[in-house]
Amino acid sequence: MRLLLLFLMIFAMPVLADPFAQGDPKTGKQLFDGAHCNSCHVKIVGGDGSAIFTRPNSIIPDATALLNRIRFCETQTGTRWTAAEETHVAAFLNQTYYHFP
């Protein structure tokens, strides 16, 4: 029984380590750039739009909040991504800025 538990813990860790394992960060970057997401961020924070991801008062505390915020931004901009595309964008943002486990 202990061996089985150890086995399950070892093989479950990679899944737990990346909340967007099904996403492709390269595809996510293409989607992010193609939807001109950064232009809106520049309007919000000025200058470097990527500062929105690293600001000290971030409203994105975890992976779930990140995915929810991506969906919120979609509704604000009229972007219509599939769930898979949302995951790609989340994977890109997580890999580049957030680093959520």
Residue ranges and their predicted role:
Residues M1-G23, Y98-P101:
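N-terminal export/targeting leaders of redox proteins
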Residues M13-D33, T75-G78:
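Electrostatic cytochrome c docking/interface patches
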Residues G28, G34-I44, V89, L93:
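The canonical Cys-X-X-Cys-His
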Residues D33, R71-T75, N94-Y98:
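Sec-exported extracytoplasmic/periplasmic mature domains
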Residues I52-I60:
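Short cysteine/histidine-rich metal-coordination sites, predominantly Zn2+-binding motifs
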Residues T64-T82:
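Short Fe-S-cluster ligation motifs
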Residues T79-P101:
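C-terminal capping alpha-helices of c-type cytochrome domains
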